Structures are given as structure tokens and as C-alpha cells.
From Swiss-Prot:
One of the primary rRNA binding proteins, it binds directly near the 3'-end of the 23S rRNA, where it nucleates assembly of the 50S subunit. Residues 221-251 are annotated as: Disordered. This is Large ribosomal subunit protein uL3. It comes from the Bacteria. SUPFAM superfamilies: Translation proteins. The keyword Nucleotide-binding does not apply. GO terms for molecular function: rRNA binding; structural constituent of ribosome. Residues 225-251 have a biased composition (Low complexity). Transmembrane segments: none annotated. Keywords: Methylation, Ribonucleoprotein, Ribosomal protein, RNA-binding, rRNA-binding. One of its GO terms (biological process) is translation.
Length: 251
């Protein structure tokens, strides 16, 4: 079992397939998603990875959390979450997970906080059909109908569908297809809609009801650190121009 990731919902758009069909997708962004801590069976009683994502200001982070991030030698994180993993899927603290952790064609489960709608009536909240506009209906056009009957049972049953607060609940959408990934920009394109509003933090995991994709990297798809020697060896355009000018003067 691999780790999931913490992603930010950017918004929705569409992608065109090779045959011309367009697919509505949700764009998810990985903002420096790093391993902050490791949970082991010997010390904690279970095996998991604690990940952090985003960049928080120091004034918005409590001192114990600042010490926690400093111990891991990672920047201050805006969002932190734990993912249960297998023993052979543990990662080093400080490892950065890339968008290549997921591959096109695989299915994922996405957990988020749905958009809050405030206090809503029974028709909008539960999809009730309502009553007729005229012909025998008085002030009950959008009412939910019977609530507690009469003397028997003389009470309102639990979970009765009535008007009340709608939305702002944690929900998980299962078996969403990954259409495309952009490793350079850290973007994941998922088919369809996902819970939450724009800029909301989401938890993205491998689908539990579908086998893991054969091409999905195990234990994780990590972002490779840039090699300083390679970058130093590469000539900049200014250096190339200077060499060419020098060669012209020698001639």
C-alpha cells in the first residue's frame, strides 16, 4: 500500500483526447508535498507517513509545530496529513513526492471538505419534489411534509430528512480516473469533479476498490534533486557568446 498525497484544488477545465473528444477534468496542484515524519510499528504501533504541503507563514504556525518541522529540516507547512502505508513503502523524511506518483489511466480516491451551502430547505437539501403550485395546496408548496405523525409514535425519528445545514462535510469520491500528469509543474488532471472549493486541500490516494496500476511507481514517485555539478558544467548563453567573440578576435 503506497502513500497518498496532499494536493490543492486549482479548478476545472477540459482536455482534448487524440480522437478529438474532450474530457472535463479537475486540476490538482502538488505544492512541495514532503515527508515530515515517519510512524513505525516499534515506536508508534502502526506504520504510516506524515506528509506536509504548502508554505505557511511563521506567525500562523504554533511553536510546537515549528519545532516539529525544524526537526525534520523541512519548510513550514500549511497542511499536514497521515497516510497508512506498507512496511516496504516507507520514505525518508524530507522526500518530495512528484506528480509522477500517479500515472494516466489509474484510479484514485479523493477526500475533501464539500462546499458549504448554509441553511437550506428540504427540496434543495434532499431533492424532494415539492407539492403542486395550486389546486388544493396552501403554504405547503416547498414543505417536507409529515414530520412526527400523531400520538403514535409521537416523536421525530432520527435521521429524518428535514431542512438544515447543507454541505461543509468531509466526503470521499471514489474511482476517479487520472487523465494526465505534468511532473514539471506538479499538476494532476483528474476526470470529473472532486469535493471542495477552489484552493481547498485534498487527500489523493490509490483507489481501494481497484488494483494498483501496473506502471505506478513503488513505493512512490519522488522528485529528483537537481545535480549542482551538472548545472555548473553547463555553459550559459552569455559564456557561449563570450567564447565566440574571443574566437573572432583571434582570427
Amino acid at each position: 500500500m503506497r502513500t497518498g498525497v496532499i494536493a490543492k484544488k486549482v479548478g476545472m477545465t477540459r482536455l482534448f483526447q487524440e480522437d478529438g473528444r474532450h474530457v472535463p477534468v479537475t486540476v490538482l496542484s502538488l505544492e512541495n508535498c514532503q515527508v515530515v515524519s515517519v510512524r513505525t510499528a516499534e515506536r508508534d504501533g502502526y506504520v504510516a507517513l506524515q506528509l506536509g504541503a504548502g508554505e505557511a507563514k511563521q506567525k500562523n504556525v504554533a511553536k510546537p509545530q515549528r519545532e516539529h518541522f525544524a526537526k525534520a529540516e523541512v519548510p513550514l507547512k500549511m497542511e499536514v496529513a497521515e497516510f497508512r502505508v506498507a512496511d516496504d513503502a516507507l520514505l525518508d523524511v524530507g522526500s518530495t513526492i512528484a506528480a509522477s506518483h500517479f500515472v494516466p489511466g489509474q484510479y484514485v480516491d479523493i477526500t475533501g471538505q464539500t462546499q458549504g451551502k448554509g441553511f437550506q430547505g428540504a427540496m434543495k437539501r434532499w431533492g424532494f419534489g415539492g407539492m403542486r403550485a395550486t389546486h388544493g395546496v396552501s403554504i405547503s408548496h416547498r414543505a417536507h411534509g409529515s414530520t412526527g405523525n400523531r400520538q403514535d409514535p409521537g416523536r421525530v425519528f432520527k435521521n429524518k430528512k428535514m431542512a438544515g445545514h447543507m454541505g461543509d462535510r468531509q466526503r470521499t469520491q471514489q474511482n476517479l480516473e487520472v487523465v494526465r500528469t505534468d511532473d514539471e509543474r506538479g499538476l494532476i488532471f483528474v476526470k470529473g469533479s472532486v469535493p471542495g472549493s477552489k484552493n481547498a486541500w485534498l487527500l489523493v490516494r490509490d483507489a481501494v476498490k481497484v488494483s494498483r496500476h501496473a506502471e505506478a511507481p513503488y513505493p512512490a514517485g519522488l522528485k529528483q534533486a537537481a545535480n549542482s555539478n551538472d548545472s555548473a558544467a553547463a555553459d550559459t548563453p552569455a559564456e557561449v557568446a563570450a567564447v565566440e567573440a574571443t574566437e573572432g578576435q583571434e582570427g
